[in-house]
Amino acid sequence: FRMAPEREQELHMTYVPLDELVERADLVSLHVPLLDSTRHIIGAEQLSRMKPTACLVNTARGGLVDDSALLQALQRGQLAGAGLDCVEDEASQVTKGLTDTPNVLITPHIGGSTADLADAMIPTIAQIIQTLAEGGELNNVVNREYLAAGQ
């Protein structure tokens, strides 16, 4: 997606290709839907081009970032940190690695919270409570070790 050049000029914006953007930016923040064309829009190649002082923020959709490549880039010091409100697979070892990385902040899909969203979540929360009350197994638990420890 690109705005009309007149609108970009009006907003004092300069369009640059993605590779140039990741090279120049101090902060890369993703705000696109997850489509075939946007899956892993940030991968090893883009991460390798980022400044070591730059941060990556993804509050849009898991799958936009190649989480394995992100973890490796962070471990190698290729970028300063990441803020993630979504990951590709909450139950993966890669996500655990990201969670254990000190320069990564992960939140549980709350970046887009609104009153309407809160109302829509009530049935899901009720189902989780019922599953727990019946001794069932929960899906998508990020910190399962605390659940198992009764904390």
Outline where the language-model segments fall.
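Rossmann-like adenosine-cofactor binding region
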Residues: M3-G97
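Rossmann-like dinucleotide-binding domain for NAD(H)/NADP(H)
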Residues: T53-Q151
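Short acidic alpha-helix initiation/capping motifs at coil-to-helix transition points
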Residues: F1-M3, M121
